[in-house]
Curated annotation (Swiss-Prot):
GO molecular function: acid-ammonia (or amide) ligase activity; ATP binding; lysine-tRNA ligase activity; tRNA binding
Name assigned to this protein: Elongation factor P--(R)-beta-lysine ligase
Presence of the UniProt keyword Transmembrane helix in the record: no
EC category name: ligase
Annotated gene: epmA
Chain sites annotated for binding ATP: 100-102, 109, 244-245, 300
Residues the entry annotates as binding substrate: 76-78, 118, 251
Similarity-based family: Belongs to the class-II aminoacyl-tRNA synthetase family. EpmA subfamily.
Single GO biological process annotation from the record: lysyl-tRNA aminoacylation
Amino acid sequence: MSETASWQPSASIPNLLKRAAIMAEIRRFFADRGVLEVETPCMSQATVTDIHLVPFETRFVGPGHSQGMNLWLMTSPEYHMKRLLVAGCGPVFQLCRSFRNEEMGRYHNPEFTMLEWYRPHYDMYRLMNEVDDLLQQVLDCPAAESLSYQQAFLRYLEIDPLSADKTQLREVAAKLDLSNVADTEEDRDTLLQLLFTFGVEPNIGKEKPTFVYHFPASQASLAQISTEDHRVAERFEVYYKGIELANGFHELTDAREQQQRFEQDNRKRAARGLPQHPIDQNLIDALKVGMPDCSGVALGVDRLVMLALGAETLAEVIAFSVDRA
């Protein structure tokens, strides 16, 4: 990129006009359904414990904080939105900036736009249907198909992800030429994620969006464990044309279980030599008060716009990608 061109937007003005129209359409979608739009902080004194997420950290040094206060840029508005649910806000959505100190590339930018919404009294399947409705409206695409995580592995890799041991998973990885990574990986979920990324994702969502649901219980994150099969979590992801678009949960409401999961994440972080992260005690305290049974989902807006416009990279649909920020 020449120095004289670096001031220019990464997206064309016509693309930015189309993006604005899509943002307005998303807001109409939720307004028509009586879902409240909210705004929550971009910074917090706590952050995610997930070993696969890397948040940005900053420091507040204003009056009364001469020693400084550690703050984290939010990787998602989830925790604050759940506190609003506990406070009685009802169904809510948010279009906001989120930040992850990770990849930069075709589908990634450290700063990105997230659409996140929560539906009290919705189970996972009802929320999946609403996500499907939104995708059809914005993308004018066919209705989605669905398959379980187990079905996806059996169909494309001929292995049962719920029962296979690490040796069996490494054997499948070898067939995908992934032995250089898999042979030294001891975490079973990381092996599963490796196989899912390289063996399943390229095969799904080609002609229509595809929901993959019932991820292993060990990958529940903030989702409930299924009451029908304790091996799986009430969690889903959505893929279309090679892109992961959304990640949703039938949300965990048990404060003690959530605390234990956060602590387990930090133990995994310590075992990998990663820094342990402060647990969001405000979220735990809110869950103790009682969050309504609900389902929620986070959707990458930049990726959605990218698909709607037929763009090849995120940079084509955001005003200034990080290399021009």
